[in-house]
Amino acid sequence: MSGAVVFFTGLSGSGKSTIARALAAELSQGGTRQVTVLDGDEMRRRLWPELGFDARSREMNIERIAWIASLIAAHGGIAIAAPIAPFATGRATARALVEPSGTFLLVYVSTPLEVCEQRDSKGLYARARAGEIPDFTGISSPYEPPDDADVVIDTTDTEVGEAVGRIRAVVERRLSLSADDRARPASDPPATRPA
């Protein structure tokens, strides 16, 4: 039983992490699959703080997150990754890494820049506009909207629960999960031969 990776992309403040955490909670209730959230900020801060925010560092960040997510999917779990993932090449790399191991779903949180700036409680956008934060996505570094997203959600007028419901429906359809599948215990792992 292969798993899935739900890979979010969108600007800072678009709602990616909020929806990702709510989706994880929803998918974990009564399910047999392990659900793991890979938050872009947390992954970067805890695992590879040496990476910068230039284009190459961003690509490396996405590749590393996707590789970890692919391992989770290969073992039948569901990884929910929520980085900004601003470049089409990085998202294509993520898809290529995941698809041999499981289902890849791209969720584009398309909340407009103006709304993201209004939500910015940390003042990151203001600092970026003042030139204090270089390579800030949407201000001094580009964001390339995807044209291949499985789900597109603008959180300007969409509640978290509605967003989660839309994504969950796609996840379940793509994994062919019925209520019976979710209630059934996970199968034993295949036997391995001694080395």
Model segments located where?
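Phosphate-binding P-loop
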Residues: 1-3
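Small-molecule kinase domains that catalyze NTP-dependent phosphoryl transfer to phosphate-bearing small molecules
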Residues: 110-113, 118-166, 174-189
